[in-house]
Amino acid sequence: MLFLEGLMQYGFLQKALITSVTVGIVSGVIGSFIILRGMSLMGDAISHAVLPGVAISYMMGMNFFIGAATFGIAAALGIGFVNQKSRIKNDTAIGIVFSAFFALGIILISFAKSSTDLYHILFGNVLAVRSSDMWMTIIIAILVISLVAIFYKEFLVSSFDPVMAEAYGLNVRFLHYFLMLLLTLVTVSALQTVGIILVVAMLITPAATAYLLTNKLSKMIMLASTFGAVSAIIGLYFSYIFNLASGAAMVLVATIIFFIAFLFAPKQGLLFSKKKEVIE
């Protein structure tokens, strides 16, 4: 009841709800492809790699989106370059590049005049989101979802069978980096909602939950977006009522939903599997 009253009275709570739900939906869309491609670590890497861009943006007094997006894309390109030009495997390249970028970000933070806003970027504070940030998040979400819809078939084929995709004449490498660009945009849009530390959880957990419930990509995307939005709403509710960290509350709700699916999913759930073993 207090939450509903707050929504009616406070503009900051309305902006927080809209921003959180938007992030939950678009994270579910991109997260589904990240899960299918086995690129969860890449999502973690890009979410950490944007930190120096955020720090530089604050030091120069410009919108953090510009710096964060630039460094996120640079990290994706750097990981691909190291992987292709050496014997280093992809997971090792990811570890090297994202650690270097994150370390650079920490050093740059120490030079920043104020660490308050940067703290919010690290851990999220959606209750302090501004109107400009809310609209930026909405625009990014619309752009990303529209591009995914346009390139849906290409992403579908290249995610399940890259060799077949190349046989069909698709540029698999271009699709990979294009998806990394979309991942970077989603990561940047989620910074003030759940923060750099927890953004990977909102990308992966709702999508992983949906993966347990269906084998169809379109249905998986719909379920992941729904779980992301529900996690955002419930997490924001507990954050507002009990004065909890908003990002952490959303991630915990998403994790609880995942474990419910992990136990009770009709075909993939742990209890269903045990029951099937007993019957056999």
From Swiss-Prot:
GO terms for cellular component: ATP-binding cassette (ABC) transporter complex. The keyword Membrane applies. Keywords: Cell membrane, Ion transport, Membrane, Transmembrane, Transmembrane helix, Transport. It is found in: Cell membrane. It comes from the Bacteria. It holds the Pfam family ABC-3. InterPro entries: ABC_BtuC-like, ABC_TroCD. Its main location: membrane. The chain crosses the membrane at residues 16-36, 41-61, 62-82, 92-112, 137-157, 168-188, 193-213, 221-241, 244-264. PANTHER family: ABC-TRANSPORTER METAL-BINDING PROTEIN (PTHR30477), IRON TRANSPORT SYSTEM MEMBRANE PROTEIN HI_0360-RELATED (PTHR30477:SF13). This is Manganese transport system membrane protein MntC. The lineage of its organism: Bacteria, Bacillati, Bacillota, Bacilli, Bacillales.
